[in-house]
Amino acid sequence: EQIYSMLGISAEVEAFGNAVLKDLKERFEKIDAVAEYNQAKVLRAMQEERVDGTCFAGSTGYGYNDNGRDKLEKVYARCFGTEAALVRPQITCGTHALAIALSANLLPGDELLSPVGKPYDTLENVIGTVPSACSLMEYGVSYRQVELMEDGTFDYPAIREAINEKTKLVTIQRSKGYAMRPTFSVQQIGELIAFIKEIKPDVICMVDNCYGEFVDVIEPSNVGADMIVGSLIKNPGGGLAPIGGY
């Protein structure tokens, strides 16, 4: 009490703060449990891939025999439950990672669908909704999006109608980004993917996982996503990595 009074904080404010902390105790405990689980998951992946001191040796950038890079990608694949992973410092940000994923999987004549409304502003130039050189639309890829319902949920009838024979890839932005809509849980994304796969089993379901890594004990790749994309600058880098993506 004396410490708070020295800072000019009244007993009433201190009591209010303690009451709020008590109300949030259960929530904080759940967050701590998720963090502990994911820490153990990462450590186990490193053990299974036998990460050792040699993996942290400097690299000339030459592609062959880069043991650290190879094992890092195997660790990521284990953590996210995928067949493989591409994790590189040469990927500068999440938008760069998404651009790589989209351009690698879409050809002229294919169609890209966003069932969660407009994606990040930075992707507009990549897709071509804002005219840009070498965009997907300039390359011959068409694009359509389905807006969310007023309550922020998926418009399933409109999504069903939007999927057609040209739909090659569906991109699902997990984070709300800069929009006034909810951030989707892994469970919600899993339900959406299952719905889409029932309509067109061979469509590629890609999740923009930026800001979503390790906030749950499962990832979108554990509930049907064919590909997840993100940035090392955010959650995976712990706020320390200045660059990188997967």
Predicted regions: what they are:
Residues G58:
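Aromatic- and Gly/Pro-rich donor/ligand-binding loops
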Residues I3-K25, D32, V42-E48, D52-C55, ...:
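Conserved PLP-enzyme active-site core in the AAT-like
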